[in-house]
A protein has these predicted regions:
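Short nucleic-acid-contacting surface segments enriched for D/E, G, S/T with interspersed K/R
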Residues: 88-115
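OB-fold (S1/OB) nucleic-acid-binding surfaces
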Residues: 51-95, 143
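OB-fold/S1-family single-stranded nucleic acid-binding modules
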Residues: 61, 120-152
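Sec-dependent N-terminal signal peptides
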Residues: 4-16
């Protein structure tokens, strides 16, 4: 009996982690999930004109390895956990991101711990990204301008 209780307490955190988001339904190119999570990682905004023309203006987040476990992924989907915020203006204000960037720089990046609500997993095999709602952020580092990567 003691072994059973010990095993139950040891697996409880894993079960709780796996249930951060609960699948709701498919809509268009997205699988919709309900729930919330607190994640640590890197926020970013790319202002490179070519990128903006192709993908549009977005503020995105890449969770660190530990936090990535909270992001819903169907079996076999090995994409890096990465998403953008559906409430762009709130994210821009929260992270204090400017609308312009100096020459030879393409993006802003910083670190933060964020809380997100609901998750829309992009499932189409084309350009696009997952979307979620930014609820709050703390431990925010100031955004730093990142130089453009030169491609040869």
């Amino acid at each position: 009996m003691k072994k059973f209780i010990l095993v139950a307490f040891m697996t409880l955190p894993m079960l709780a982690q796996a249930q951060t988001f609960k699948y709701q339904k498919d809509i268009s190119n997205f699988k919709q999930y309900k729930g919330d999570a607190t994640l640590t990682g890197t926020y970013s905004r790319t202002l490179d004109p070519e990128y903006l023309e192709y993908m549009g203006d977005a503020i995105c987040f890449e969770p660190d390895q530990k936090s990535s476990a909270h992001i819903p992924r169907p079996k076999g989907d090995e994409r890096t956990a990465w998403f953008c915020f559906s409430n762009f203006e709130q994210a821009k204000k929260t992270f204090k991101l400017p609308d312009t960037i100096k020459k030879d720089y393409c993006s802003y990046e910083g670190k933060a711990t964020i809380t997100i609500k609901d998750y829309n997993l992009f499932v189409e095999e084309t350009e696009g990204f997952d979307l979620t709602h930014l609820v709050s952020a703390k431990n925010i580092t100031s955004a730093k301008a990142v130089k453009c990567e030169t491609q040869y």
